[in-house]
């Protein structure tokens, strides 16, 4: 019988085997300075591509003042605990209401981070009889969400509408055979790894031929 801990010591995995060169460089890098499009890395100013500060609001004076005021009033530990149990607050619900109003939606829900949001959405929407059809270059958060899926999934070639239609035909055939379930198509507005745009109009046009819901990351 193999010792699973012993295996971890002997096999560091595809990234771990480069740990001596990777650590502090392309794994766990240390950036210095204020949050921005340019920060210092190992003493040199670099362009930063991987921050979630998309709108550049992190250092806006009004945002920083709100951060400071909230820290003074509530401290850094409030709320504490899982939100469903003891971590909910009026501030959460107020922000959700404001976001929903801004987007002209009925309601909104906050997640800790976008990765969790997509994973949770797939899990919440799809059941074991449902089928997901998704682009081959979807982000890792979508792939991880699909790993939790009890139902079937079909992948189509990146931005290939003809192949997407083929996979929809397979999905529809499976739904017809099961006599239950629905179809969810997943793609992205802008593919984060390559930077190209998803063919949203073309995918949406397939709704003229097939019955499915569309999830765009």
Tell me the role of every PLM-derived stretch.
Residues 110, 115-121, 141-142, 193:
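Short glycine/serine/threonine-rich phosphate/pyrophosphate-binding segments
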Residues 65-113:
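Conserved N-terminal alpha-helix of the aminotransferase class I/II PLP-enzyme fold
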Residues 122-140:
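Conserved PLP-anchoring active-site segment centered on the Schiff-base-forming lysine
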Residues 10-78, 212:
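N-terminal "arm"/small-domain region of PLP-dependent enzymes with the aminotransferase-like
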